[in-house]
Curated annotation (Swiss-Prot):
Post-translational modification: Phosphorylated by AMPK. Upon stress, phosphorylation by AMPK is sufficient to induce mitochondrial fragmentation.
Bilayer topology term: Peripheral membrane protein
Protein family (similarity comment): Belongs to the MTFR1 family.
Task of the protein: Mitochondrial protein required for adaptation of miochondrial dynamics to metabolic changes. Regulates mitochondrial morphology at steady state and mediates AMPK-dependent stress-induced mitochondrial fragmentation via the control of OPA1 levels.
Main location: mitochondrion
Species of provenance: Rattus norvegicus
Disulphide bridges, residue numbers: none
Name of protein: Mitochondrial fission regulator 1-like
Source species, domain of life: Eukaryota
Coiled-coil portions: none
Residues annotated with Phosphothreonine modification: T27
Phosphoserine: residues bearing it: S38, S100, S107, S221, S222, S235, S258, S270
Length: 289
């Protein structure tokens, strides 16, 4: 009998007292022995210097086990590795995994990657949302500035403020100039630009009766004239301060209302769009008439 022929276990002793139930079943049933497992071994394993180790391939010589990821404990018998962390694979292990053997670790990593939340995607979405909100606020500021410059007309002052400024026509231009600025341009420096207070002769030219009475008093005594002129100037300055206070209160009220509207960019944009469409409708109606 040849050496390569495999002999089933039930054919060793065809008869005798040592025959068991397994041998009896094997002789009666058409069973075949399982084929031997064949592994892919490293090439030229017989040429390696194995010292006293017999050149018989074992599981340590199988290529796909030695080259597997994170399996530093698996090594070829020809390698000399005293420690695991200092191990480097030999050039003979650069081989592909056997296609018949499934790579379970790779499938597990893919499943874990699918189960984990997409943190980079979430961070990107949050960054995009922040950038969009910043851009929306900038657009709202620009639109509000344009709308303020377009809507600040002479009608900005109400009837009360126009009545207050009516006895002083020389200051109407200054009040009208302050309304043409944007909200951010209205500062305390605008008060410096108010023209100088008119002198007493201007007041006399405005009211001739007052000039006659003052002329009589000046003829009486120069000291009384100085006192009266000082009292007139102080009363006029007090009147100007009161007018400035009225105008400042009016501006603060209008600014507070506009600032409340400026808090929400969406409200500003919708208001500007509403005005724009209203102007378009007015133009269309005028053209139609």
């Amino acid at each position: 009998m040849e050496a390569n022929v495999t002999i089933p276990i039930w054919q060793n002793k065809p008869h005798g007292a040592a025959r068991s139930v397994v041998r009896r079943i094997g002789t009666n049933l058409p069973l075949k022995p399982c084929p031997r497992a064949s592994f892919e071994t490293l090439p030229n394993i017989s040429d390696l210097c194995l010292k006293d180790v017999p050149p018989v391939p074992t599981l340590a010589d199988i290529a796909w086990i030695a080259a597997d990821e994170e399996e530093t404990y698996a090594r070829v018998r020809s390698d000399t590795r005293p420690l695991r962390h200092t191990w480097k694979p030999s050039p003979l292990i650069v081989m592909q995994r056997n296609a018949s053997v499934p790579n379970l670790r790779g499938s597990e990593e893919r499943l874990l990657a699918l189960k984990k939340p997409a943190l980079p995607a979430l961070s990107r979405t949050t960054e995009l949302q922040d950038e969009l909100s910043h851009l929306r606020s900038q657009i709202a500021k620009i639109v509000a500035a344009d709308a303020a410059s377009a809507s600040l007309t002479p009608d900005f002052l109400s009837s009360g403020s126009s009545n207050v400024s009516s006895p002083l026509p020389c200051f109407g231009s200054s009040f009208h100039s302050t309304t043409s600025f944007v909200i951010s341009d209205i500062t305390e420096e605008t008060e410096v630009e108010v023209p100088e207070l008119p002198t007493i002769p201007l007041l006399c030219s405005a009211s001739p009766e007052c000039c006659k009475s003052e002329h009589k008093t000046t003829c009486s005594s120069s000291e009384e004239d100085d006192c009266i002129s000082l009292s007139k100037a102080s009363s006029f300055a007090d009147m100007m301060g009161i007018l400035k206070d009225f105008h400042r209160i009016k501006q603060s009220q209008d600014l507070s209302r506009s600032l409340l509207k400026e808090e929400d960019p969406a409200v500003l944009i919708s208001e500007v769009l509403r005005r724009k469409f209203a102007l378009k409708e007015e133009d269309i109606s005028r053209k139609g008439n």
